[in-house]
Amino acid sequence: MAIIHDIVSAKQQARKLLVLLVDPEKQDSLAAMGSLLCLPDMIFVGGSTGAYSQACLSQLRAHTDRPILLFPGNIAQFTPTADALLFLTLLNARTPEVLIIPHIQIAQQVLQSGIEVISMGYILIDGAHQSSVERATHCTPIPQSDSAMILSTAIAGQLMGKQLIYLEAGS
Protein backbone atom coordinates (compact mmCIF):
# COMPACT_ATOMS: atom_id res chain seq x y z
CA MET A 1 0.00 0.00 0.00
CA ALA A 2 3.02 2.29 -0.02
CA ILE A 3 2.60 3.76 -3.51
CA ILE A 4 -1.11 4.58 -3.22
CA HIS A 5 -0.33 6.11 0.17
CA ASP A 6 2.31 8.34 -1.46
CA ILE A 7 -0.18 9.43 -4.15
CA VAL A 8 -2.95 10.17 -1.64
CA SER A 9 -0.51 11.98 0.65
CA ALA A 10 0.68 14.19 -2.22
CA LYS A 11 -2.93 15.08 -3.05
CA GLN A 12 -3.71 15.92 0.58
CA GLN A 13 -0.65 18.20 0.66
CA ALA A 14 -1.59 19.79 -2.70
CA ARG A 15 1.75 18.53 -4.02
CA LYS A 16 1.97 17.69 -7.70
CA LEU A 17 3.45 14.44 -8.96
CA LEU A 18 5.11 13.89 -12.31
CA VAL A 19 4.44 10.51 -13.91
CA LEU A 20 6.15 9.23 -17.05
CA LEU A 21 4.15 6.76 -19.19
CA VAL A 22 6.42 4.37 -21.09
CA ASP A 23 5.07 2.16 -23.87
CA PRO A 24 6.96 -1.18 -24.00
CA GLU A 25 6.81 -1.06 -27.80
CA LYS A 26 8.91 2.10 -27.74
CA GLN A 27 11.44 1.01 -25.12
CA ASP A 28 14.42 1.44 -27.47
CA SER A 29 14.43 5.14 -26.54
CA LEU A 30 14.84 4.46 -22.79
CA ALA A 31 18.62 4.24 -22.90
CA ALA A 32 18.76 7.64 -24.58
CA MET A 33 16.67 9.11 -21.77
CA GLY A 34 19.29 8.05 -19.22
CA SER A 35 19.38 10.51 -16.33
CA LEU A 36 16.00 11.99 -17.29
CA LEU A 37 14.41 8.86 -15.84
CA CYS A 38 15.17 10.16 -12.34
CA LEU A 39 12.92 13.20 -12.86
CA PRO A 40 9.45 11.67 -12.56
CA ASP A 41 8.05 10.66 -9.18
CA MET A 42 6.94 7.36 -10.68
CA ILE A 43 6.80 5.57 -14.01
CA PHE A 44 3.81 3.85 -15.62
CA VAL A 45 4.63 1.03 -18.06
CA GLY A 46 2.04 -0.13 -20.55
CA GLY A 47 0.39 0.34 -23.89
CA SER A 48 -2.64 -0.58 -25.94
CA THR A 49 -1.02 -3.49 -27.73
CA GLY A 50 0.28 -6.83 -26.49
CA ALA A 51 3.90 -5.78 -26.07
CA TYR A 52 5.43 -7.59 -23.11
CA SER A 53 6.47 -5.37 -20.21
CA GLN A 54 9.22 -7.44 -18.53
CA ALA A 55 12.04 -6.39 -20.88
CA CYS A 56 10.97 -2.77 -20.56
CA LEU A 57 10.85 -3.08 -16.76
CA SER A 58 14.36 -4.53 -16.65
CA GLN A 59 15.69 -1.70 -18.78
CA LEU A 60 13.97 0.91 -16.62
CA ARG A 61 15.33 -0.65 -13.42
CA ALA A 62 18.85 -0.26 -14.83
CA HIS A 63 18.32 3.52 -15.13
CA THR A 64 16.11 4.56 -12.22
CA ASP A 65 15.05 3.73 -8.70
CA ARG A 66 11.63 5.37 -9.11
CA PRO A 67 8.55 3.23 -8.46
CA ILE A 68 7.39 1.42 -11.60
CA LEU A 69 3.67 0.78 -11.96
CA LEU A 70 2.15 -1.46 -14.61
CA PHE A 71 -0.41 0.37 -16.75
CA PRO A 72 -1.47 -2.68 -18.77
CA GLY A 73 -3.41 -2.58 -22.00
CA ASN A 74 -4.09 -6.30 -21.63
CA ILE A 75 -3.37 -9.16 -19.27
CA ALA A 76 -0.31 -10.32 -21.24
CA GLN A 77 1.49 -7.23 -19.95
CA PHE A 78 1.28 -8.34 -16.31
CA THR A 79 4.51 -9.10 -14.51
CA PRO A 80 4.85 -9.35 -10.72
CA THR A 81 8.27 -7.66 -10.80
CA ALA A 82 6.77 -4.15 -10.98
CA ASP A 83 6.26 -2.14 -7.80
CA ALA A 84 2.49 -1.94 -8.31
CA LEU A 85 -0.28 -2.78 -10.75
CA LEU A 86 -2.82 -0.21 -11.86
CA PHE A 87 -5.88 -2.47 -12.07
CA LEU A 88 -7.62 -0.59 -14.86
CA THR A 89 -11.32 -0.52 -15.66
CA LEU A 90 -12.35 1.31 -18.82
CA LEU A 91 -15.37 3.05 -17.32
CA ASN A 92 -17.06 4.05 -20.57
CA ALA A 93 -16.75 0.58 -22.10
CA ARG A 94 -19.98 -1.26 -22.76
CA THR A 95 -18.89 -4.85 -23.37
CA PRO A 96 -17.91 -7.55 -20.87
CA GLU A 97 -14.83 -8.32 -22.99
CA VAL A 98 -13.44 -4.98 -21.82
CA LEU A 99 -15.29 -4.37 -18.55
CA ILE A 100 -14.71 -7.57 -16.58
CA ILE A 101 -13.47 -10.62 -18.49
CA PRO A 102 -9.75 -9.65 -18.48
CA HIS A 103 -9.96 -8.89 -14.75
CA ILE A 104 -11.39 -12.36 -14.05
CA GLN A 105 -8.71 -14.01 -16.19
CA ILE A 106 -5.82 -12.41 -14.30
CA ALA A 107 -7.28 -12.04 -10.77
CA GLN A 108 -5.79 -15.13 -9.15
CA GLN A 109 -2.34 -14.55 -10.64
CA VAL A 110 -2.35 -10.94 -9.40
CA LEU A 111 -3.50 -11.94 -5.92
CA GLN A 112 -0.91 -14.71 -5.63
CA SER A 113 1.89 -12.40 -6.80
CA GLY A 114 1.57 -10.11 -3.79
CA ILE A 115 2.01 -7.02 -5.96
CA GLU A 116 0.46 -3.77 -4.71
CA VAL A 117 -2.81 -3.30 -6.58
CA ILE A 118 -4.21 0.18 -7.21
CA SER A 119 -7.76 0.24 -8.56
CA MET A 120 -7.97 2.81 -11.35
CA GLY A 121 -10.90 3.98 -13.43
CA TYR A 122 -9.91 4.80 -17.01
CA ILE A 123 -12.05 7.21 -19.02
CA LEU A 124 -11.57 7.50 -22.76
CA ILE A 125 -12.20 11.04 -24.01
CA ASP A 126 -12.43 12.10 -27.65
CA GLY A 127 -9.05 13.46 -28.73
CA ALA A 128 -10.16 14.46 -32.25
CA HIS A 129 -8.70 11.31 -33.81
CA GLN A 130 -9.18 7.59 -33.24
CA SER A 131 -6.80 6.47 -30.51
CA SER A 132 -5.10 3.11 -30.15
CA VAL A 133 -7.25 2.47 -27.06
CA GLU A 134 -10.40 3.16 -29.05
CA ARG A 135 -9.25 0.76 -31.79
CA ALA A 136 -8.28 -1.97 -29.32
CA THR A 137 -11.45 -1.78 -27.20
CA HIS A 138 -14.08 -0.57 -29.68
CA CYS A 139 -15.08 1.88 -26.94
CA THR A 140 -16.75 5.14 -27.87
CA PRO A 141 -14.93 8.10 -26.28
CA ILE A 142 -16.83 10.75 -24.37
CA PRO A 143 -16.76 14.10 -26.22
CA GLN A 144 -14.41 16.63 -24.59
CA SER A 145 -17.26 19.13 -24.61
CA ASP A 146 -19.42 16.87 -22.41
CA SER A 147 -17.82 17.75 -19.08
CA ALA A 148 -20.96 16.68 -17.20
CA MET A 149 -20.68 13.12 -18.58
CA ILE A 150 -16.94 13.01 -17.89
CA LEU A 151 -17.53 14.14 -14.30
CA SER A 152 -20.43 11.71 -13.81
CA THR A 153 -18.33 8.84 -15.15
CA ALA A 154 -15.45 9.76 -12.82
CA ILE A 155 -17.81 9.97 -9.84
CA ALA A 156 -19.33 6.59 -10.76
CA GLY A 157 -15.81 5.16 -10.77
CA GLN A 158 -15.13 6.67 -7.37
CA LEU A 159 -18.38 5.24 -6.01
CA MET A 160 -17.36 1.80 -7.36
CA GLY A 161 -14.18 2.02 -5.28
CA LYS A 162 -11.67 3.24 -7.85
CA GLN A 163 -8.75 4.80 -5.99
CA LEU A 164 -7.60 6.83 -8.99
CA ILE A 165 -9.19 8.12 -12.20
CA TYR A 166 -7.21 8.45 -15.44
CA LEU A 167 -8.44 10.59 -18.33
CA GLU A 168 -7.20 9.48 -21.77
CA ALA A 169 -7.61 11.68 -24.83
CA GLY A 170 -5.71 9.51 -27.28
CA SER A 171 -2.33 8.17 -28.15
Protein language model features and the residues they cover:
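Hydrophobic faces of well-ordered beta-strands that scaffold small-molecule active sites
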Residues: 16-22, 41-45, 68-70, 85-87, ...
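Short, ordered loop/turn segments at secondary-structure junctions
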Residues: 25, 47-50, 73-75, 90-91, ...
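Catalytic cores of alpha/beta
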Residues: 31-35, 70, 74-87
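Glycine-centered flexibility motif
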Residues: 46-47, 56, 97, 121, ...
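Alpha-helix-loop-beta-strand connector modules within alpha/beta enzyme cores
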Residues: 54-74, 106-118, 171
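Conserved anion-binding
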Residues: 77-154
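Short, structured loop/turn "capping" segments at alpha-beta junctions
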Residues: 130-135, 161-167
